[in-house]
Amino acid sequence: MILALDVTDRDEALKIAEDVWEFVDAIKVGYPLILTTGLGIIRELAEFAPVIADFKVADIPNTNRLICDQVFEAGADAVIVQGFTGRDSLDACIEIASEYRKDVFVVSEMSHPGGAEFLQPAAESIAKMALEAGAFGLVAPATRPERVRKIRRIIGDKLTIISPGVGAQGGKASDVIAAGTDWVIVGRSIYKAESPKEAAREIAEEIQAELRGEY
């Protein structure tokens, strides 16, 4: 399970990470936290789990190189980038990641309703491009397990799929795992819970039950 830590307070972020680290495989940070705390929070959170920088990098190749260099220099283990900018922009991100021996996840389709408007028609082409380019993985929506299943058929077992949208957006961990995702991404259902630790524990138990075939 990946924790989407979309809070805007450094102390809160570190407290939640400390509370839930035993139940998560990675922590995903994005603009809400980075813009208020700076890139330095990445190394602090890395004390608890590997950090994925969710910047959805989407620019020309040179700018992508500059962004990814800063992300990995700050201590991130992976970066999330957009695929719709094309192969040369993606190659630039993978080039920098390889220099740091880090990973790139490519967004194939986002989890909100609008993700089906423009990204969904291109998602399968993006998945094929990510595979050919040598990306580490793809982002596919937990809110639409059938789409995860479709993407998995395209890439086989060659790429890792991570799926946002579990919990507050309506996705169910067991459903999307059954569809072929490797890691679910959970945010508000954990960090807005009265007890983030207990919320993380419950979701982790649901995931383990699905993996054992109990659902």
Swiss-Prot record:
Q: Which reaction does it catalyse?
A: orotidine 5'-phosphate + H(+) = UMP + CO2
- Can you tell me which residues bind substrate? 6, 28, 54-63, 111, 164-174, 187-188
| Gene Ontology CC annotations of this record | cytosol
Coiled coil regions in record: none
**The protein's annotated pathway:** Pyrimidine metabolism; UMP biosynthesis via de novo pathway; UMP from orotate: step 2/2
Q: Pfam families annotated for this entry?
A: OMPdecase
Active site per database record:
K56
InterPro entries found in the cross-reference section: Aldolase_TIM, OMPdecase, OMPdecase_arc, OMPdecase_AS, OMPdeCOase_dom, RibuloseP-bd_barrel
Q: Which family does it belong to?
A: Belongs to the OMP decarboxylase family. Type 1 subfamily.
Cross-referenced NCBIfam families: PRK13813.1 (NF010386), pyrF (TIGR01740)
Q: What does this protein do?
A: Catalyzes the decarboxylation of orotidine 5'-monophosphate (OMP) to uridine 5'-monophosphate (UMP).
- How is this protein named in the record? Orotidine 5'-phosphate decarboxylase
